[in-house]
Amino acid sequence: MASLLLAATLLSSDMAAQEKYVYNEFYFQRSSLFSELPVGKKDIVFLGDSQTNGCEWHELLGMKNVKNRGISSDVIQGFIDRVDPIVDGQPAKVFILGGVNDISHDLTPDSLCTSMEKLIVKIKQGSPRTKIYLQSLLPIDNSFGRYRKMVGKEQVIVETNRLYKEMAERHGVTWIDLYSKMVDPVTGSMRKGLTNDGLHLLGAGYLVWRDAVLPYVKK
């Protein structure tokens, strides 16, 4: 997550922040591979960052037509910059999860929602037949002490999810609440046993994720 560099320049107090991203080597390695791999009209695409990247989705879901398009350290602007090969393939479904790396760079919930909306509009305009599913950000657990840039960001995640859900409803996009299925209601952190670093999932976490999305994947 920390290996992706971001520089944000505020143009003025009444204008949105403009973000410029310098992507790491892994971003280009993986995105260049994705540009060579075909996406078909029957395919189901999972688009995201390291949390998506870390799963063998076709095996977990038992479906050969599921494509993993996750890149570790990626941000929402990165999704926008590399989504064209997905859109060109006119897939049946796209499941999106992203924003935690943006939060680590101190972007606001409003900024994240604006970027996510741009991504969704781009997909809808380029591939109207594609069904889009926006998944909530996952809870974190700062007790591991691994990601100092995420310290104190629990409520930013909650607020971003609120804005994401409202935006998804405006655009007729299906909202999938992963957060409530993984959060400890007492501590507000990710449930024990789902992560071993406070951010990325263990196998048990991916099973929770699978159970949440499977009805939509099979639909």
Task: Annotate each predicted stretch with a short phrase.
Residues 109-119, 157-160:
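Charged helix-capping and loop-helix junction motifs
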Residues 139-219:
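Catalytic His-Asp segment of secreted/periplasmic serine-dependent ester chemistry enzymes
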Residues 47, 52-65, 77-114, 133, ...:
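Oxyanion-hole/transition-state-stabilizing segment in secreted/luminal serine hydrolases
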Residues 120-124:
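Surface-exposed amphipathic alpha-helices with a cationic face
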Residues 127-131:
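A short helix->loop->beta-strand "cap" motif at the edges of active sites that frequently abuts
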Residues 46, 66-68, 175:
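Conserved beta-strand scaffold positions in the cores of enzyme catalytic domains, especially
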Residues 1-45, 53, 57, 218:
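N-terminal secretory targeting modules
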Residues 20-21, 62-76, 104, 198:
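Acidic/histidine-rich helix-loop elements
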